[in-house]
């Protein structure tokens, strides 16, 4: 690859970000993040006044399809002697970790790169700047923003297309041209707006190092102060991106001294790890506010013994946290809960008066209205028998968003490492390995999403 020190405008613009930046391009065996692999990697790394080029073919450890060979010129024989990504990973990681990655369609290159590192057991994450979006933002008068269109529009000399090294140089030349045409101030404004995630202000060296050592996948992240006391705890789907956004937006977050991260196979696993960290540090939900004003309140049913020894169904707010006893049912509001309780009692032949779920307007001393019609359990069951049937039927209380299901086994698989874990959920809560139950305000929406998108990973137990 050419020395690009002749691109002074680009070098200055990237230096203004205050951290290294790399213009990167990958060639792959196809477009699937799950099944395709990298065949070529190239980048230009800008760090202050130094520009470091890198290029390598990569053995994908699978056949290269004919279409890709025709498109890129890279076939099986081209990569026959090339190293697999696993042999390059430890060389690449220190060059790219902590960099801003610029790429034409950055989601493609970033995701392939992140997942290639993950398959090697190496967490990798980076802020990204998509040069397709940057072209659209800087040149809105044009309709096409593919690299071919940009090369033609700006008269950029390109030795070939769909080869990583040549594409990197073409993107670098385009950015230098855009800086010359638009000016550094305009370029910087658009670039900073499009950068994802936004960069936090200057951080203590140790905290910055820990931030850039995070993965951009699922996990539980604990923020600690200088004394090792917990400041904030959250489960994440994209740990690095979400942590960086928090640091950019919150001065309080920037007061953290260190981070502790537990990677997860999926979002349910992340919630169990969040529960684990909360227990380890003795952190109560009230000490870890998670935008409580925006959270939906959920209700559940707890079985409580009344004055006469009769088991009653009591509606209670289901708060985030760990519980010794299982919650029964999950309801978005009191109206839905009361209606569900009445239908549940009727369907299971239980007495609404004994359960203390009579509608408003009925006092406890009022004769059971169901008994007056001659069809209530209080006419046939003794108290102990009714209590036993109530306890047995409690698991059949409905759960919002689960349809007719009451208890589930949900499997999560890490697509990169192959780690597979199963989780028991019942009554709207997670059953933890120690026998306790855990609820988080994000859990109902998460399981509803899994019903919609991952039904094949759910086994309905009850």
Residue ranges and their predicted role:
Residues 65, 86-89, 144, 165-168, ...:
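Amphipathic alpha-helical transducer elements in NTP-driven molecular machines
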């Amino acid at each position: 690859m050419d020395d690009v020190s002749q691109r002074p405008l680009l070098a200055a613009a990237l230096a203004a970000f205050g951290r290294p930046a790399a213009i990167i391009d990958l060639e792959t065996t196809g477009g699937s993040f799950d099944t395709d692999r990298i065949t070529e990697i190239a980048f230009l790394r800008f760090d202050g006044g130094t520009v470091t080029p890198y290029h390598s073919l990569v053995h994908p450890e699978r056949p290269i399809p004919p279409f890709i060979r025709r498109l890129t010129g890279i076939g099986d024989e081209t990569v026959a002697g090339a190293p697999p990504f696993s042999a390059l990973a430890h060389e690449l990681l220190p060059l790219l970790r902590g960099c801003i990655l610029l790429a034409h369609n950055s989601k493609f290159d970033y995701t392939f790169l992140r997942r290639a590192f993950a398959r090697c057991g190496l967490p990798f994450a980076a802020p990204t700047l998509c040069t397709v979006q940057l072209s659209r933002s800087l040149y809105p008068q044009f309709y096409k923003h593919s690299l071919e269109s940009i090369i033609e529009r700006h008269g950029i000399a390109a030795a070939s297309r769909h080869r990583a090294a040549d594409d990197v140089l073409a993107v670098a030349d385009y950015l230098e041209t855009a800086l010359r045409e638009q000016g550094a101030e305009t370029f910087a404004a658009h670039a900073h707006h499009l950068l994802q995630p936004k960069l936090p202000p200057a951080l203590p060296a140790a905290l910055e190092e820990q931030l850039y050592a995070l993965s951009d996948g699922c996990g539980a992240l604990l923020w600690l102060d200088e004394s090792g006391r917990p400041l904030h705890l959250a489960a994440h789907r994209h740990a690095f991106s979400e942590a960086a956004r928090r640091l950019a937006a919150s001065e309080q977050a920037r007061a953290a001294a260190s981070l502790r991260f537990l990677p997860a196979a999926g979002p349910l696993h992340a919630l169990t790890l969040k529960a684990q960290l909360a227990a380890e540090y003795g952190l109560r939900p009230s000490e870890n506010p998670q935008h409580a004003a925006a959270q939906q309140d959920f209700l559940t049913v707890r079985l409580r013994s009344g004055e006469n020894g009769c088991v009653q169904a009591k509606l209670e707010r289901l708060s985030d946290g760990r519980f010794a006893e299982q919650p029964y049912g999950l309801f978005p509001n009191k109206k839905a809960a009361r209606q569900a309780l009445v239908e549940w009692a009727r369907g299971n032949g239980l007495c609404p008066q004994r359960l203390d779920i009579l509608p408003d307007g009925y006092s406890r001393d009022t004769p059971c209205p169901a008994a007056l019609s001659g069809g209530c359990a209080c006419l046939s069951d003794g108290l102990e028998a009714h209590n036993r049937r109530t306890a047995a039927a409690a698991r059949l209380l409905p759960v919002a968003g689960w349809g007719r299901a009451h208890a589930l086994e949900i499997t999560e698989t890490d697509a990169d490492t192959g780690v597979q874990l199963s989780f028991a959920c019942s009554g709207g809560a997670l059953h933890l390995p120690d026998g306790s139950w855990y609820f988080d305000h994000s859990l109902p929406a998460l399981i509803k999403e899994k019903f919609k998108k991952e039904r094949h990973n759910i086994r309905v137990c009850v």
